[in-house]
Amino acid sequence: DCQSKDLTSAPPGIPADTKSLDLKYNAFTQLPSDAFQGLTALTWLSVSNNQIESLPAGLFDQLVELKQLYLQGNELKSLPTGVFDSLTKLTRLDLDNNQLQSVPHGAFDRLTNLQTIRLTSNQWDCSVCEILYLSQWIRGNSAKVKDSSGQMEDPDGV
């Protein structure tokens, strides 16, 4: 448990067999692409409520067992293409309370086990073409899209 420790980077020497990593409420503004390298057994990860502005490509590539990912309460403005592609076992993704304006086409397509995604309280820009992917994805997966209370979100809200 590394929450609320004023950390500015992921601590070194995290055991490779770690299953749960709680890094919420720290002082991260960025994460290096190798921050979670070797943590192939990780099933639960929270880097929520930091000040992370962007995610590097490849950040989650080795987290092939990850089931829950909490990124809410940061300052994410965009997501790199393919950032979630290796997370095929993911069942929950929280992206609410960021500054996202759109998501890359196909961002959630490989998340075939996803049961819950939270996208509320972002700054969605409905004038950009990229928002069409998100709108269509939400319409096709509306039962998975939840608000902050866990209730299904109205797909017409996007």
Feature locations, PLM:
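Consensus "Asn ladder" position of solenoid repeat domains
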Residues: K5, N26, N50, L71-N74, ...
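LRR N-terminal entry segment and analogous cap-like coil->beta motifs
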Residues: D1-W44
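Repeat-solenoid scaffold signature
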Residues: T91, L95-C126
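Recurring C-terminal helix/loop segment of individual leucine-rich repeat
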Residues: S9-G13, L31-Q37, A57-D61, L79-D85, ...
